[in-house]
Amino acid sequence: MATIEECRAALEKLSDNMQQAEGDVRTAAALDRSVSCRITDLDVTFMGRLTGGRIVVHDTIQGPPPEKAQIRLTMAGDDLVALVDGELNFAKAWGSGRVKLEAGLRDLLQLRKLL
């Protein structure tokens, strides 16, 4: 099971990858939205913002997020690490329910370029 530190590092790596992206991926990463990433097996939520092509984590809280972020991810810690490391295909994980992504329709259309 991934630790909180490993999950935070995975989010940082994802953020770095997004900032270095080009083309459609860079455009999708340019959104300015609130973000939450709930790690179910650790019962922790990373709260932050997607801005300037990066995910900036502002807070880590126990349990579910107190407010609904504009972009919401939910998954196990190992799945987050595997996704960022390229060992888990997002589409398959999302289709099987291992990973949940919730956002407005317009944001979902943009985010599919990222994922």
Protein language model features and the residues they cover:
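Feature captures hydrophobic
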Residues: M1-L115
